[in-house]
Every structure is written in C-alpha cells, then in structure tokens.
Design a protein with these regions (language model features):
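Mobile gating loops/cap/lid regions near enzyme active sites that modulate substrate access
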Residues: 146-149, 153-267
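Sec/Tat-exported extracytoplasmic proteins
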Residues: 19, 33, 122, 126, ...
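Substrate-access "cap/lid" subdomains that shape
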Residues: 2-106, 133-157
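Active-site rim elements
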Residues: 2-3, 67-68, 129-142, 169, ...
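A general structural motif at alpha-helix termini
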Residues: 30-33, 41, 122, 186, ...
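Alpha-helix N-cap/helix-start motif at coil-to-helix transitions, marked by capping-box chemistry
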Residues: 6, 109-116, 176, 180, ...
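Alpha/beta-hydrolase fold catalytic core
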Residues: 112-157, 163-165, 169
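C-terminal, loop-rich substrate-recognition/catalytic regions characterized by aromatic stacking residues
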Residues: 76-122, 203, 244-267
Length: 267
C-alpha cells in the first residue's frame, strides 16, 4: 500500500509527537541516536499494525495518489514483474495476534478511512462453523490479494510481462500463512510450526527457488520439473500455484467491494 501525501504527513506527525519534536526542529532527526528513533516509533508498531511505515507519494518523485495511473502511463522502463501472495496470508494473525473477528477499531487501524467499506462486507460473513476459513480469506483478499490482482491486470494491460503465483502449501500448523514462503526461498521458517517432514517441502523449495532465481537472471521464471509458467493477462488469467505438485490454474478476479480503492489504507 503506497500512502498518499496526506496519510504520510499524518503518520509523520505521529512520529514527531512521540519523538518530542516540532516542525522547526525536524533537522534533529538527522542526529538522533538510533535508540531514540526506535523508542519514538515503538508505539506506532505496537500490536497488529501493518501500516505504520511504508512507501509514500512524496509529491516530488511521484505525483498524485494513484499507483495504477503511474503504471498505465508507462513513463519508466518496461520491466517484467513476478508477483504473488500466499493463500492464507492472514491466518498468521489469527494465531499470533489472535485476530478472530473484526470491529470498528481494528478496521480503522488496518484500513483507515476505508474501514466503513470493509466493515459493511465483513458483516456479511456467516458466523458458522466455517467462519475461521471465510474470515481468513476475507482479510487476505482485502489486505493482500486484491491489490496484487489489480496491479497485475493494470501492468499487463500496459504491456508489461507479468508472472503471477500463489503459495498454497498448507502442510503446517498455520497453513499457507504470511511469511511461510521464507522456508522455501531463504531456508528460514521462524513462523512455521509442525511442518510436514516428508521430502515434499524440499522438492517445493527447489521448484520455487529455481523459478525465482531464473526470473532474477533471465526475466522468466522456470525450474526443472515444474510446469511451464505462462504470462498473466486480464483475459488469459494464468497463475502458478506452488504446492506439491505445482500446477497452473485460472486466477480469480478481485473479490473486494467495487468501492474499495487500490490504496487500502488512508487517513
């Protein structure tokens, strides 16, 4: 989520207040001890908070507030994109932060002034035996996948080569949660518990690392033993699913409310 100028300024004001600084003393940030910076930002990162920091439209290098408009304009170099999400991204937060439901306070923390749109759609989820699965899907869609899909569609429309993926591997306690790709790409798995001990994870690691390495070197993801990875576009919506075995399927369109902006967090 790229923050608009107003949102970025609001978050900056929060940091300045925690740091005990005023606008006429902004230059003191340049000489602040790193310990003081960490102390000032700590309240902004406390608990389940995804948007305290991130890229911004600064009004200098990037004008306006519409990331998709910049992609449509194609003012920069035409580059290939490798994009994707994990199927159960927000299941990590269900377990780590005990996010088992949504209220106005949490919605505002995650989505800012977009919260009413999110709450309206959250209330449509049936509170039955399938609520956990549906809630994880809902939050994953609004926070992660919908933006990924919208960007992939826009970039492919603008002529960029787009390769889309989804990690479905769920043979572990938190399923295909946020950060679970680290065990395959970087041999790190600090958030992963009760992982399948069969040879399958090692095979998937070879597939994913091989495909990503090939993309870095040649601009096309591929690995020995994997199916051919077609480009994604709005009509031919092909997506590589990382599982055991890996396979290609059709990617669903965004499932968020049509009133939900691409920038999911704004103040």
């Amino acid at each position: 989520c790229i923050r608009d100028v107003h949102t970025a300024r609001c978050i900056t004001d929060q940091f300045m207040a925690h740091a005990g600084l005023t606008k006429d003393r902004t230059n003191e940030i340049l000489t602040m001890p790193w310990e003081a910076i960490l102390k000032a930002q700590a309240p902004m990162f406390r608990g389940f908070n995804l948007h305290a920091a991130g890229p911004v439209f600064d009004g200098i290098n990037f004008e306006g507030n519409d990331a998709l408009a910049l992609i449509r304009q194609q003012t920069g170099p035409r580059i290939s994109l490798l994009m994707g999400t994990n199927r159960d991204e927000t299941n990590l937060y269900w377990h780590i932060y005990h996010v088992h439901d949504m209220d106005e306070g949490l919605a505002e923390k995650l989505f800012g002034n977009r919260a009413p749109i999110v709450m309206k759609n959250y209330r449509k989820i049936p509170k039955d035996e399938n609520f956990h699965q549906r809630f994880v899907h809902f939050l994953t869609e609004y926070i992660y996948r919908a933006g990924d899909i919208d960007m992939a569609e826009t970039a492919s429309d603008a002529g960029q080569d787009v390769y889309l993926y989804r990690l479905d591997w769920d043979r572990q306690a938190y399923k295909a949660c946020h950060a679970s790709e680290t065990q395959f790409l970087m041999s790190m798995g600090s958030v992963i518990h009760a992982v399948d001990a069969s040879p399958a994870p090692e095979e998937l690691k070879e597939d994913k690392r091989g495909a990503f390495t090939a993309f870095i070197k040649k601009g096309m993801p591929a690995a020995e033993g994997m199916p051919s990875w077609p480009k994604f576009n709005r009509e031919n919506r092909r997506i590589m699913v990382f599982d055991h075995p890996c396979h290609v399927e059709r990617a669903a369109a965004s499932e968020t409310d049509l009133a939900m902006p691409f920038q999911v967090f704004a103040l």
